[in-house]
UniProtKB/Swiss-Prot annotation:
Oligomeric form and interacting partners: Consists of a catalytic RNA component (M1 or rnpB) and a protein subunit.
Pfam families per UniProt: Ribonuclease_P
Lineage: Bacteria, Bacillati, Bacillota, Bacilli, Bacillales
Protein name: Ribonuclease P protein component
SUPFAM superfamilies for the chain: Ribosomal protein S5 domain 2-like
GO biological process: tRNA 3'-end processing; tRNA 5'-leader removal
Domain of life, source organism: Bacteria
Homology family: Belongs to the RnpA family.
The keyword Nuclease is annotated on this UniProt entry: yes
Known catalytic reactions: Endonucleolytic cleavage of RNA, removing 5'-extranucleotides from tRNA precursor
InterPro entries listed in its UniProt record: Ribosomal_Su5_D2-typ_SF, Ribsml_uS5_D2-typ_fold_subgr, RNase_P, RNase_P_CS
Regions that span the bilayer: none
């Protein structure tokens, strides 16, 4: 994921926290805010020191970024997302992280549904 698609500034985080909607599951909390006219979504990641050491926190962030990269075509491009990892995410592998993110994004109805080919 390109750096220009990441939320880094505290003001941008606060704007999404204040004005955005949130939804969660056991592993992640996702805040989303619609940005009109944007041609690509932006994500901000937050992994607390309570989750684990730096290696663990960075691994979780890599997994989240890669999951968003793989789901890029299904994600609404006009939104900004903040993903906050919770403690259970520390013990998950990549596939579990991706599955959990798909679940929480479906709960928030920000993930486009795949076309159903069965009749």
């Amino acid at each position: 994921m390109k750096k220009k698609y990441r939320i880094k500034k505290n003001d941008d985080f606060q704007k999404v926290f204040r004005r955005g909607k949130s939804f969660a599951n056991r592993q992640f909390v996702v805040y989303t805010l619609k940005q009109e006219g944007s041609n690509h979504f932006r994500i901000g990641l937050s992994v607390s020191k309570k989750i684990g050491n730096a290696v663990c926190r960075n691994r979780i962030k890599r997994y989240i970024r890669q999951s968003f990269h793989e789901l890029e075509s299904q994600i609404n491009p006009e939104n900004e997302y903040i993903i906050i990892a919770r403690k259970p995410a520390a013990n998950m592998d990549f596939h579990e992280v991706k599955k959990s993110l798909i679940h929480v994004l479906k709960v928030g109805r920000v993930l486009k549904q795949k076309p159903n080919n069965s009749k």
